[in-house]
Curated annotation (Swiss-Prot):
It catalyses: N(2)-formyl-N(1)-(5-phospho-beta-D-ribosyl)glycinamide + L-glutamine + ATP + H2O = 2-formamido-N(1)-(5-O-phospho-beta-D-ribosyl)acetamidine + L-glutamate + ADP + phosphate + H(+). Pfam families: AIRS, AIRS_C, FGAR-AT_linker. This is Phosphoribosylformylglycinamidine synthase subunit PurL. One of its GO terms (biological process) is 'de novo' IMP biosynthetic process. One of its GO terms (molecular function) is ATP binding. Its EC number is 6.3.5.3. Part of the phosphoribosylformylglycinamidine synthase complex involved in the purines biosynthetic pathway. Catalyzes the ATP-dependent conversion of formylglycinamide ribonucleotide (FGAR) and glutamine to yield formylglycinamidine ribonucleotide (FGAM) and glutamate. The FGAM synthase complex is composed of three subunits. PurQ produces an ammonia molecule by converting glutamine to glutamate. PurL transfers the ammonia molecule to FGAR to form FGAM in an ATP-dependent manner. It comes from Cereibacter sphaeroides (strain ATCC 17025 / ATH 2.4.3). Mg(2+) 2 binds at D115, D266.
Length: 719
């Protein structure tokens, strides 16, 4: 097959700038082949190289006594004691999910699960953070239904419980949804598998499903803005098979137990190219591949297609040579392909052979370690103008506006499509704050949450970045867990625009300050840029996934109050309405500054709640919608009415940070008040749970009517 001529148009179609192509010519001293151009394009795009973000990601705190492995591997590894580790990561599948919602979301789940089990962990929990356009937008319902069905279809069939996440709607996502997938697994701390190749002449082995043409160019597509050619990009979306992935998991874990593996890497973005280059680069070795040996499910595939295919359920391994027969037998037992496709070499070369031809011969380090790195121009986001006055609103009408919005409505429509109980270790299912999963065979449990408030980040990237971490800290604390570590999924627009790059820089600085203050180091993550359509960017959305630990289920704080429990707020309420959910949902406004986060107060109040958990019947953090929404959700979830004695729009709906709502048995109220006074922590009694009415200040509504609205609004909006 004749390869196409390398033209400026072909170079641009590969996402390479003219100066980047000149850099390639300088590195290799000649014009690249078509396959080589594809390899450079895949390895130098944002999705694989982090060329616009690397400078700032390096500033994040990533270490601590609990951290076994931080960023740079497939996922982060954190010590949970007793010789065990939790391995976790969050990453995006935004562009594919907009183009082909079901498969885009499904393969996002599959990819993050492989990131976890390629390190030797059995997945125990999944979450997803989803951002969609306005419910009445022509594409939104189709995308929501496809994404949720895809997540459920893959996760349920694979057999991992989905235990949490978030769903939001905003016009900024009309042309670019966000699908951020999280997975966590358990492994023995001394049996972690890494991706760095070692040893010369070691066999490089292809494992799993066969290679097809699906996903060719997917990584490059994920590093570009959308325009009116979006439908043409549908072939770049991968197709997943969760049953094959389940077999791949079992085969990999069995293989790892046989002492056969030198290094292992899943094939994700840029497929065979990225996995081989990363293994060689980390091990300071070259890689030679013979593509004739690659298992193919389609005829006449070219070297270009095989190197850039993003077919799912595939791994690449450097194998101990003497273990070939053992390893082959394991994969044949699981009805999966096992093929030796290359070897490690001492030279700094990435050598690709197909037929009797050399299709690529490149310096391997140039593809990864010396890829372009940019210090993009950025401008600081201007300080938000003061919030315009807010007239007092009927609190019941304010509450109805929130619970009738699909962003804050009950999400049973979503959760019920996910299996949250598979593996039989789920303690708290979706919809009750952080998810909690037992560490099988031990008294311990792990808690999981994902959080961000994009309105805050747009108004004030630094405070919004801090708040995403602080809310994750509170959500873990509210179930009784001690926060351990975090993963970040940075979703932003075009970094070549200084104002967008300024949002990114501000958010990174805020996240860094918060994870340092709250001892929640970033151990893994993902950056998704160019989330724009026709020049319109998404809201800056730096999603934080966080993990906490309970040493036993005795430390668990329940999520439901009991009849007659007293409602109290831990933390100070000043009544901050800027960028609040009430402004957005009731008044259609997004003005004012984001609430500022006092990290000292966050830590102090969180430690206070964990120290006094035995006095508390139930707890939740206060965030979107303030006291009114949190109290209603807590009461309604228990089938109880509610009376809040505080009055005033700002007091009921303000979104001041570092606050928790707790339900306390009347007999324990004085003890908690005494503990708060001794600790110097603000504690305000705000009402009581019980009855069949919801009373906010001086106005009331029947619980049954509000519950009907809350539980029906999501399905009504999506249709």
């Amino acid at each position: 097959m004749t390869e196409p001529e390398i033209t400026p148009e072909l170079i641009a179609a590969h996402g390479l700038k003219p100066d980047e192509y000149e850099r390639i010519l300088g590195i290799i001293g000649r014009e690249p082949s078509f396959t080589e151009l594809g390899i450079f394009s895949a390895m130098w795009n944002e999705h694989c190289s982090y060329k616009s973000s690397k400078k700032w990601l390096r500033t994040l705190p990533t270490t601590g006594p609990q951290v076994i492995c931080g960023p740079g591997e497939n996922a982060g590894v954190v010590d949970i004691g007793d010789g065990q580790a939790v391995i976790f990561k969050m990453e995006s599948h935004n562009h594919p999910s907009y183009i082909e919602p079901y498969q885009g979301a499904a393969t996002g789940v599959g990819g993050i699960l492989r990131d976890v089990f390629t390190m030797g962990a059995r997945p125990i929990a999944a979450m997803n953070a989803l951002s969609f356009g306005e419910p009445n937008h022509s594409k939104t319902a189709h995308i929501v239904k496809g994404v949720v069905e895809g997540i459920g279809g893959y996760g349920n069939a694979f057999g991992v419980p989905t235990v949490g996440g978030e769903v939001r709607f905003h016009r900024a996502y009309n042309g670019n949804c966000l699908v951020n997938a999280f997975a966590a697994g358990l492994a023995d701390a001394d049996k972690i598998f890494y991706s760095a190749a070692s040893g010369v002449g070691m066999p490089v082995v292809y494992l799993g499903a066969k290679t097809g043409r699906d996903g060719v160019g997917g990584a490059t597509m994920a590093s570009a803005e959308f325009d009116d050619t979006i439908e043409e990009k549908r072939p770049t979306v991968q197709v997943g098979d969760p049953f094959t992935e389940k077999r791949l998991l079992e085969a990999c874990l069995e293989l790892m137990a046989s002492d056969s593996v030198i290094s292992i890497q899943d094939m994700g973005a840029a497929g065979l190219t990225c996995s081989a280059v990363e293994m060689g680069d980390k091990g300071d070795l070259g890689i030679k591949l013979q593509l004739d040996n690659v298992p193919q499910r389609e005829a006449n595939m070219t070297a270009y297609e095989m190197m850039l295919s993003e077919s799912q359920e595939r791994m690449l391994m450097v194998l101990k040579p003497e273990k070939e027969a053992v390893a082959r037998a394991i994969f044949e037992k699981w009805d999966l392909d096992f093929a030796i496709v290359g070897e490690t070499i001492p030279e700094d070369r990435f050598l690709i052979l197909h037929g009797n031809e050399v299709k690529a011969d490149l310096p391997l380090k140039a593809l990864s370690g010396t890829a372009p790195e940019y210090d993009r121009p950025w401008v600081e986001t201007p300080a938000a103008a003061p919030m315009a006055p807010v007239a007092e609103v009927d609190p019941i009408e304010g509450l109805k506006a929130l619970i009738g919005s699909p962003s804050y409505a009950h999400k049973a429509w979503v959760w019920e499509q996910y299996d949250s109980q598979v593996m039989a270790d789920t303690v708290r299912a979706p919809g009750l704050g952080a998810g909690v999963v037992r560490v099988h065979g031990t008294p311990k449990a792990l808690a999981f949450t994902s959080d961000v408030t994009p309105r805050y980040v747009k108004a004030n990237p630094f405070e919004g970045g801090k708040q995403a971490v602080a809310e994750a800290y509170r959500n873990l604390t509210a179930v009784g867990a001690k926060p351990l570590a975090t993963t970040d999924n940075m979703n932003f627009g075009n970094p070549e625009k200084p104002e967008i790059m300024g949002q990114f820089v501000g958010a990174i600085k805020g996240i860094g300050a918060a994870v340092a203050a709250l001892d929640m180091p970033i151990v893994s993550g993902n950056v998704s840029l160019y989330n724009e359509t026709d020049g319109v960017a998404i809201l800056p959305t730096p999603t934080i996934g966080a993990v906490g630990i309970l040493q036993s289920l005795d430390e668990l704080i329940a999520g439901q109050p009991e009849e007659g429990d007293v409602a109290l707020v831990i933390g100070e309420t000043k009544g901050h309405l800027g960028q609040s959910a009430l402004l957005a949902e009731l008044l259609g406004r997004e003005d004012g500054d984001a609430p500022h986060v006092d990290l000292d107060a966050e830590k102090r109040h969180g430690e206070f709640l964990r120290a006094n958990r035995k006095l508390v019947s139930a707890a939740t953090d206060l965030s979107d919608g303030g006291l009114a929404l949190a109290a209603f959700e807590m009461a309604e979830g228990a089938g109880l009415g509610l009376t809040l004695t505080v009055t005033g729009t700002a007091q009921l709906f303000g979104e001041d940070q570092a606050r928790y709502l707790v339900a306390v048995h009347p007999d324990q109220t004085k003890a908690l008040q005494a503990a708060a006074e001794a600790a110097g922590v603000p504690l305000q009694q705000v009402g009581q749970f019980g009855g069949e009415e919801v009373t906010l200040g001086t106005v009331s509504a029947p619980l049954v009517d509000l519950s009907r609205l809350h539980r029906g609004a999501f399905a009504a909006a999506i249709g």
